[in-house]
Amino acid sequence: MSNPVVLNLHLISDSTCETVAAVARSALEHFKSVEVNEFVWSCINSYEQIDKIMLTIEKDKYNFIMYTMFDDDIRKYLKQKAGIHEIPCIPILSHVIREISCYLNIKKDPYINTSIGLDDEYFTRIDAINYTIAHDDGQNLWDIDQADIIILGVSRTSKSPTSIYLAYRGYRVVNIPLINSIELSVDLSKMKNKLIVGLTIDIDRLIEIRRARLVSMKNQNNYGYVDYEHVLMEIRETKRICAKNGWPIIDVTQKSVEEIAATIIQYFTKMQH
């Protein structure tokens, strides 16, 4: 088997890097065979900072820069430095801004406030992240009634990364693993005004993921974890529980975390109305 292509992806912004990171990760979903080393450079607003970034870049590797930069002089300097080292340097918003400017025949603002505001939305997001981390993998269910969303599923169905992604969007999430022969410690059927959703996956894909997990943990002797009949029983039980309670179930086999989260948000929004 040939070695995967390794890409050093440098995300540069004069703000938080949230926008450029979201675009970059969505784009890289189309290149599953590429191994990405992500470097995040936020709050970059001086020539000196750009010089330091360039010094850290290993020039003999595959490097790629994606950025958002609103100061024209700093942006030109970044492009110049990247060009000297023959590193692709892509502005993710320039084309969109230019198209809007041309269509409306209005020049873009010379300056926008890119500072991180500590507003209510910020604190809501931080609270959601803290809550979700504390309730990962079925922990601390004593205050599960404070959750917005409850995610169920067998092991390795992207429950945790999906929960964190949703938390970053401001949702308080609990994720609970479904394990054969072990009953849930809480009665979810009595939960009111909570979105409860199950995650399922193709059995062959799940076994493949679990085998890789066992190898990484050097625990290949855990045969039950990857036994076909055992795994099939787990998946069927998840579907049975969700069907019995009328909870939606999402097949995550061909979905990214972003796609899973988007589907859950659609269910949540529909429930709210």
Swiss-Prot record:
It catalyses: N(tele)-phospho-L-histidyl/L-threonyl-[pyruvate, phosphate dikinase] + ADP = N(tele)-phospho-L-histidyl/O-phospho-L-threonyl-[pyruvate, phosphate dikinase] + AMP + H(+); N(tele)-phospho-L-histidyl/O-phospho-L-threonyl-[pyruvate, phosphate dikinase] + phosphate + H(+) = N(tele)-phospho-L-histidyl/L-threonyl-[pyruvate, phosphate dikinase] + diphosphate. Its EC number is 2.7.11.32, 2.7.4.27. It is an enzyme of class 2 (transferase). The keyword Transferase applies. The keyword Nucleotide-binding applies. One of its GO terms (molecular function) is phosphotransferase activity, phosphate group as acceptor. Pfam families: Kinase-PPPase. This is Putative pyruvate, phosphate dikinase regulatory protein.
